[in-house]
């Protein structure tokens, strides 16, 4: 474009006239301007000059917007966490730059039982330093299992077997727990 623009200047008249300019190289592709002076020399009169400016507009600044940090509850399936994580990754956006491209250092979703993954997104552009932003995807830790065992139990002798069986069953069922993900209680009592 610059070369073609330089060649648009013309002149007429003069004796043995010739035209030159101080155009040199074009301004930077990422933005800038250059004032060029053309000079016509002729053997019959003083030099005649004119000037014009060639401008390349500045590249639009890169604007990078990361997704907000996101927290997911524990005890979901790993597939559900992976799906939520992958959707979250797509919530990044950017604009501006020249020949801009975006990448990230994603290493995968955190475990469904709890953890966090920090992702850094980077936009590279021909006309400015890399722009980066970070966000964190967290899965809350699964609640700790708290097991309360049955208390020792002593039964009097000479009861019927069905009474002992009923007391034993009730005693086995007196063990309780809280927490965990999809937790279940079992015992070796038979």
Label the predicted regions.
Residues 1-190:
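Proline-threonine-serine-rich low-complexity tracts
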């Amino acid at each position: 474009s610059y070369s073609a623009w330089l060649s648009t200047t013309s002149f007429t008249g003069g004796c043995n006239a010739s035209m030159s300019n101080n155009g040199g190289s074009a301004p930077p592709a990422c933005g800038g301007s250059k004032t060029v002076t053309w000079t016509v020399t002729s053997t019959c009169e003083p030099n005649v000059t004119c000037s014009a400016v060639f401008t390349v507009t500045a590249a639009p600044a890169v604007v990078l917007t990361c997704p907000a940090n996101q927290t997911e509850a524990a005890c979901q399936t790993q597939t559900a966490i992976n799906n939520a994580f992958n959707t979250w990754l797509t919530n990044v956006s950017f604009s501006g730059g020249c020949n801009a491209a975006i990448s990230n250092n994603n290493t995968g979703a955190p475990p469904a039982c709890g953890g966090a993954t920090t992702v850094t997104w980077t936009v590279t552009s021909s006309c400015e330093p890399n722009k980066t932003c970070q966000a964190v995807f967290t899965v809350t830790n699964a609640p700790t299992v708290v097991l309360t065992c049955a208390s020792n139990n002593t039964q009097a002798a000479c009861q019927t077997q069905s009474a002992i069986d009923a007391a034993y069953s009730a005693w086995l069922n007196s063990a309780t727990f809280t927490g965990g993900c999809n937790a279940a209680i079992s015992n070796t009592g038979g």
